[in-house]
């Protein structure tokens, strides 16, 4: 097995980056592709009371355990199996269980700050930024956090205005300049997704 092709997919909350990642994932046989979500690498907070965990800024680079993420990416590149953490968004903490991820020909890393850390960027073969209007992103974030993460409307809006938007402007939007490809309209941009798939297949044939 050759060195895997590492693809980083980033963009603001609700931009459609997960949709793009899944669209690319579904174009390949499951035996040759793996997905790594940056959300899985939020820091372990077992020593912090729940009330304090609720107040944390989860859109700041310091919220992520990039040391572990980088170690896992390097292990996958070296064709080693990893134990990916599982993050509980309602408890704001990692679960005790992990998910075994085996090395594959293609590794997709998806998350809001994938291109922010230079040590992560240098491991990536393809860097993608998914660009979507802010009003579309906030509506998607609202629906997701209420339906999937047990949040209230007021808490989501307050978090967006005080944390999510400022962090987007400070860290996520500036990381766009590191992207090889910028995809507008998120996962609905079929032409861009098909172009990415063709590019990945080309890299695999080298």
From Swiss-Prot:
It holds the Pfam family PRK. Gene3D superfamilies: P-loop containing nucleotide triphosphate hydrolases. It is found in: Cytoplasm. Signal peptide: none annotated. InterPro entries: P-loop_NTPase, PRK/URK, Uridine_kinase, Uridine_kinase-like. It catalyses: uridine + ATP = UMP + ADP + H(+); cytidine + ATP = CMP + ADP + H(+). The keyword Kinase applies. GO terms for cellular component: cytoplasm. The keyword Thylakoid does not apply. It is an enzyme of class 2 (transferase). Its EC number is 2.7.1.48. Pathway: Pyrimidine metabolism; CTP biosynthesis via salvage pathway; CTP from cytidine: step 1/3; Pyrimidine metabolism; UMP biosynthesis via salvage pathway; UMP from uridine: step 1/1. ATP binds at residues 11-18. GO terms for molecular function: ATP binding; cytidine kinase activity; uridine kinase activity. Keywords: ATP-binding, Cytoplasm, Kinase, Nucleotide-binding, Transferase. NCBIfam families: PRK05480.1 (NF004018), udk (TIGR00235). Belongs to the uridine kinase family. This is Uridine kinase. It comes from Clostridium botulinum (strain Langeland / NCTC 10281 / Type F). The lineage of its organism: Bacteria, Bacillati, Bacillota, Clostridia, Eubacteriales.
């Amino acid at each position: 097995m050759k060195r895997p092709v590492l693809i980083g997919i980033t963009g603001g909350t609700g931009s459609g980056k997960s949709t793009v990642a899944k669209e690319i994932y579904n174009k390949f046989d499951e035996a040759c592709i793996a997905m790594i979500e940056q959300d899985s690498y939020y820091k372990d907070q077992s020593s912090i009371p729940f009330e304090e965990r609720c107040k944390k800024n989860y859109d700041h680079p310091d919220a992520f355990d990039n040391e572990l993420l980088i170690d896992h990416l390097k292990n996958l590149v070296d064709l080693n199996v990893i134990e990916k953490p599982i993050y509980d968004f309602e408890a704001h903490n990692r679960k005790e269980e992990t998910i075994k991820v085996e090395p594959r020909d293609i590794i997709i890393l998806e998350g809001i700050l994938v291109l922010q850390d230079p040590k992560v960027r240098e491991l990536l073969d393809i860097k993608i930024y998914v660009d979507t209007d802010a009003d579309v992103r906030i509506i998607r974030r609202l629906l997701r956090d209420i339906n999937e993460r047990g949040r209230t409307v007021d808490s989501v809006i307050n978090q967006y205005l005080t944390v999510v938007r400022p962090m987007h402007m400070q860290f996520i939007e500036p990381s766009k300049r590191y992207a090889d490809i910028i995809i507008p309209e998120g996962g609905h941009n079929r032409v861009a997704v098909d172009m990415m798939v063709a590019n990945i297949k080309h890299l695999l044939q080298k």
